[in-house]
């Protein structure tokens, strides 16, 4: 299979989920063997680095890449869409420290890629072919198994101690189904997580338009009012538990976790031929697994 890049550029602008900063992002065609590279156009010298696991420095509610002054947060949704559509080479220019969150999914990235199309290049794709089972287990009970397969496949299972999200599964057995089955799954959080995240200086750009918020633990009306006021949202009835906005899929949280896995594992720096099976994944665990797999890949060269 040959490498591919974009046929034409496309652009987005919007606020960052965690910084709240308004950001412009340009996606440009790139020469073969470039990989996915991100340029901070707002910094002196326009520092540019490849989006690979080597530069992951933080994973609190998103994946952060950092090397010296160069730092870009919440890269996983854009990377997920690029990987799913087979974009091997692309230069992403951003004028701030974070990718725009858009609606919290990969939908708009997918639509843009579909609109401009792909350009086949001369070089062959770089592919890591899984030849034997690989297993990673975290101390917190997260698991990842990567198995040999004829193609790229992902299975996800998530569990939470709550009635709404006690257990969900999502699967993707063909990347051709990504646009329909995965791309519109939005990032999510629980109401009980919002105040701690705000205190950590995160989700400054969060609202009900760019995240699926889950209200599963009853709280006082005063407490819920505080949360919605902080997010600049209309006040809600504290007696009504559930999702605070309509679902795009019945198992949207699990599908979004799958979306994140594709983006995080793309930090390997090449394509993967194998089946990824995960239990209780998250950005920290995903990127730790990717780093170990990348070290294995580099050591074999």
Task: Walk through the language-model features, giving the residues of each.
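Short acidic-hydrophobic catalytic motif
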Residues: 1-301
């Amino acid at each position: 299979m040959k490498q591919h890049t974009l046929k034409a550029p496309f652009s987005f602008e919007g606020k960052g989920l965690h910084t709240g900063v308004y950001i412009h992002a340009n996606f440009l065609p790139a020469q073969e063997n470039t990989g996915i590279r991100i340029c901070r156009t707002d910094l002196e010298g326009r520092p540019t680095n490849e989006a690979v696991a080597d530069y992951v420095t933080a994973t609190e509610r998103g994946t952060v890449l950092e090397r010296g002054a160069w730092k870009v947060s919440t890269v996983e949704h854009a990377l997920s869409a690029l990987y799913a559509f087979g974009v091997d080479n692309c230069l992403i220019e951003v004028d701030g420290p974070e990718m725009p969150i858009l609606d919290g999914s990969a939908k708009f990235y997918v639509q843009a890629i579909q609109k401009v199309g792909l350009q086949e290049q001369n070089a062959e794709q770089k592919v890591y072919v899984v030849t034997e089972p690989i297993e990673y287990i975290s101390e917190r009970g997260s698991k990842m198994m990567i198995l040999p397969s004829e193609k790229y496949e992902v299975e996800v299972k998530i569990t939470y101690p709550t009635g709404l999200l006690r257990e969900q599964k999502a699967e993707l057995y063909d990347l051709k189904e990504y646009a329909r089955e995965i791309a519109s799954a939005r990032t999510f959080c629980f109401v009980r997580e919002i105040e701690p995240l705000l205190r950590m200086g995160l989700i400054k750009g969060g609202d009900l338009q760019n995240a699926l918020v889950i209200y599963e633990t009853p709280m006082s009306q005063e407490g819920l009012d505080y949360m919605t006021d902080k997010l600049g949202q209309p006040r809600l009835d504290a007696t009504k538990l559930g999702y605070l906005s309509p679902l795009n899929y019945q198992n949207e949280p699990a599908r979004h976790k799958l979306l994140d896995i594709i983006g995080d594992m793309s930090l390997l720096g090449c394509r993967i031929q194998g089946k990824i099976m995960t239990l209780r994944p998250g950005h920290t665990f995903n990127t730790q697994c990717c780093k170990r797999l990348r070290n294995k890949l580099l050591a074999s060269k």
